A protein has these predicted regions:
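Nucleotide/pyrophosphate-binding catalytic subdomain
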Residues: 1-221, 386-387
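Short phosphate-binding/catalytic loops that engage adenosine nucleotides
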Residues: 34, 95, 229, 300, ...
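Glycine-rich beta-alpha junction loops
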Residues: 43-44, 180-182, 229-231, 235-240, ...
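Short hydrophobic alpha-helical runs that function as membrane-insertion/retention elements
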Residues: 173-177, 231-233, 303
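A conserved regulatory-domain signal marking ACT and ACT-like small-molecule sensing domains
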Residues: 243-404
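Terminal amphipathic helices with adjacent charged low-complexity linkers/tails
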Residues: 41-44, 50-56, 233-253, 309
Length: 404
């Protein structure tokens, strides 16, 4: 019997009706000859009683600082409740199931509370239930340190749980259930005509996820890519075949699909800020790379970096603006920060080596009076920095330009 991982997101487990649909997916997998290992997120989204954001709000309302260790213990509760409820639903439908915490499933992590990394999975803890034909319903998002402290894997960490279990248990594939029919060519809230991408390469989906598409966590893609573990993005609320994420070459049949052109998709990230450090006439105590090294030490991630003889230009998360400004002021640097920016990225392995794609993007945006403040490209992506007020229009323009 082939083992599969089925991960259900917060919307999929939010109500009795939704959970019944999820249970049908699990039962259907068993009827098709698969053995499902289930991973669940916390119930619902922000504002609902057991959602992660709601639990964080509870802690913040106390007005007292909660340690990272204790915060992880608190916010892991949502997944525990969800696992117990889902296991109960399965048992009520005649499927022998058991709820397991991250610890009970053998997910061992480091002690980087709030964003822990999985060190290993002690698979015997899951296999002993599989051997009894009992479906494990495992809490996503959480693990445990060597010393027994509960940890969480960061925002979207249930995807990571599904991927590490798939890798450790040598699963046939991982199925990620959400509320859309698969990975779309663009955000369907912006592009009504956005299409489902039926198949996509690991690298492309990693770039899409890293650039703002919220269908799957980029770390989950990295884990799957290392072991060639297929991932399928599916809709709990439909029978759409979804999007399959695998490794394939340029000349594979999957790249010849009629609904795909030069690009695979478009993603965007809001709340970016552009930092310009001016070196004309000297610049305080900065030795060049020193500031970038210091930002890394501070845990501030930089993006879209361009280095010139007279200036450095890069972007940071808008939440980091004040810390960046303080550092530059301490170093007596000449600098400016442009806030309220968004990064819009086009993704596609087939743009590699194709001349004129950047020029085509800039022409299309210019025709629509969208100012571009910065660009960056790699072998599979081209990104532009625009004002946030122009980001939606930029996505629309580029989606139309490349006929996605």
């Amino acid at each position: 019997m082939k083992l599969i991982i089925q991960k259900f997101g917060g919307t999929s487990v939010a109500t009795n009706e939704n959970r019944n649909l999820a249970v049908e997916k699990i039962i259907n997998a068993k009827e098709q000859g698969f053995f499902p290992v289930v991973v669940v997120s916390a119930i619902g989204r922000k504002g609902e009683p057991y959602a992660t954001d709601t639990l964080i709000q509870y802690a913040n309302r106390m007005g007292k600082k909660v340690s990272p260790r204790d915060m992880d213990l608190l916010i892991s509760c949502g997944e525990t409740i969800s696992a117990v409820i889902m296991a109960s639903e399965l048992n009520a439908r005649g499927v022998d199931a058991v709820a397991l915490t991250g610890e009970q499933a053998g997910i061992i992590t480091d002690n980087n509370y709030g964003d822990a990394s999985v060190l290993r999975v002690e698979t015997n803890k899951v296999y002993r239930h599989i051997e009894r034909d009992r479906v494990p319903v495992i809490t996503g998002f959480q693990g445990v340190t060597e010393y027994g402290d509960v940890t969480t894997l960061g925002r979207g960490g249930s995807d990571i749980t599904a991927a590490v279990l798939g890798q450790a248990l040598n699963a046939h594939q991982v199925e990620i259930y959400t509320d859309v029919d698969g990975v779309m060519t663009a955000d369907p809230r912006i592009i009504n005509s956005a299409k489902v991408i039926r198949s996509v390469d690991y690298e492309e989906i990693f770039q899409m996820a890293d650039s703002g598409a919220k269908v799957i966590h980029p770390r989950a893609v990295e884990i799957a890519m290392k072991s060639d573990l297929p991932i399928v993005i599916k809709n709990t609320f439909s029978d759409s075949p979804g999007t399959i994420i695998t490794r394939f070459k340029k000349d594979d049949e999957t790249l010849a699909m009629g609904d795909r052109g030069l690009l695979t998709g478009i993603a965007y990230l809001h709340n970016r800020a552009q930092v310009v450090i001016d070196y004309t006439g000297g610049n305080g105590e900065d030795s060049g790379d020193d500031i970038l090294d210091k930002l890394a030490e501070m845990g501030i991630s930089i993006d879209l970096i361009n280095i010139f003889t007279d200036k450095k230009v890069f972007t940071v998360d808008g939440e980091d603006c004040e810390r960046v400004a303080r550092l530059l002021e301490e170093r007596k640097a000449k600098f400016s920060i442009k806030k309220d920016c968004s990064k819009v990225t086009v993704i596609g392995n087939r743009i590699r080596g194709v001349p004129g794609v950047m020029a085509r993007i800039l022409r299309a945006l210019n025709r629509n009076n969208i100012k571009v403040y910065q660009t960056a490209d790699s072998h599979a992506t081209i990104s532009v920095l625009v004002k946030t007020e122009d980001a939606k229009n930029a996505v629309i323009v580029l989606h139309d330009e490349f006929k996605l």
